[in-house]
Curated annotation (Swiss-Prot):
One or more lysine residues are methylated. Signal peptide: none annotated. PANTHER family: 60S RIBOSOMAL PROTEIN L12, LARGE RIBOSOMAL SUBUNIT PROTEIN UL11M. Part of the ribosomal stalk of the 50S ribosomal subunit. Interacts with L10 and the large rRNA to form the base of the stalk. L10 forms an elongated spine to which L12 dimers bind in a sequential fashion forming a multimeric L10(L12)X complex. GO terms for cellular component: cytosolic large ribosomal subunit. It comes from Lachnoclostridium phytofermentans (strain ATCC 700394 / DSM 18823 / ISDg). SMART domains: RL11 (SM00649). Belongs to the universal ribosomal protein uL11 family. This is Large ribosomal subunit protein uL11.
Amino acid sequence: MAKKVTGYIKLQIPAAKATPAPPVGPALGQHGVNIVQFTKEFNARTANQEGMIIPVVITVYADRSFSFITKTPPAAVLLKKACNLKSGSAAPNKTKVATIKKSEVQKIAELKMPDLNAANVETAISMISGTARSMGITVVED
């Protein structure tokens, strides 16, 4: 018989930098999860993605054990990294902060494909392009 699920915890944590300090510790502590064990496992699993923010969904079971799934980094983080930006535009409709080639957007879309609700790569490209526009990044043809 499967374990009884008591809750889900969704967090965005920098890769290989999970610590028992807030926000990770309190979120896990209130569900009775072994915080040190989670941080060690998360840091080991995300060691190759240094510098990225990794969304994680933690499933907590009745016996206080847990399992977790790491997702791909948010599209905004990938776009900022591709354009070497600290943050997007405060007024994206007025101030453009960068340009990105459609081929780079396609690479990001292919990377994000498992986590996107998109039927094909073209749809994923349009979703990532929309995120770029809302950040003040102009998408240009190759």
